[in-house]
């Protein structure tokens, strides 16, 4: 089972919160104290809470569940995409479009348009268009890929969303809440933990911290998927003889 240790969190700077003047009082139970005007997060809470979240994600993946990684702020977007791709899951790394979950019917139509344009770009359709029309479709394709590329193969709503930066991604969290989709989120000292099923109190700005979260969640999803494949192989009679 994927777990993260206190040492790994300390090395990644997970315990460094925001400046004390920007704090959200709802995070008080998870704060150890302050140092040089910066809140220090109590990792005695974070370690078990994160490991519980990892176990949950692994369990979801073991049942063929879909995990949606969400992180659109600059510090998180690259790591979010890399982690989701590495475990064959889904991501939103550019901008959360309002209604991405709650208005899935419309989003699905946009995904269909994206896939149509992708086909046209490779089957020679673009070559038959005027230069101006081809340019317009290429721009539309790029725009749709940027917004929806990470969810174009999701085929339905996710079973859990994993969020870096609860404050920044409050719309995504609210949409998931409205649909009863569980939320796992990294919550810094300036954010509210409301509406989050699995709270991970921690630094949501430092690259090392972010990569620790995303890498661990990807590993948990992979491990869960591995369990699912092992069960499937056993059912299909493909178990190797010892």
UniProtKB/Swiss-Prot annotation:
Biological-process GO terms, alphabetical: translation
Molecular functions (GO terms): structural constituent of ribosome
Key words, A-Z: Ribonucleoprotein, Ribosomal protein
Annotated Gene Ontology cellular component terms: cytosolic small ribosomal subunit
Keyword Ribonucleoprotein attributed: yes
InterPro entries: Ribosomal_uS2, Ribosomal_uS2_bac/mit/plastid, Ribosomal_uS2_CS, Ribosomal_uS2_flav_dom_sf
Ribonucleoprotein is among the record's keywords: yes
SUPFAM superfamilies hit by this protein: Ribosomal protein S2
HAMAP family recorded: Ribosomal_uS2_B (MF_00291_B)
Entries under NCBIfam families matching the protein: rpsB_bact
Protein family: Belongs to the universal ribosomal protein uS2 family.
Protein name: Small ribosomal subunit protein uS2
Species per Swiss-Prot/TrEMBL record: Shewanella halifaxensis (strain HAW-EB4)
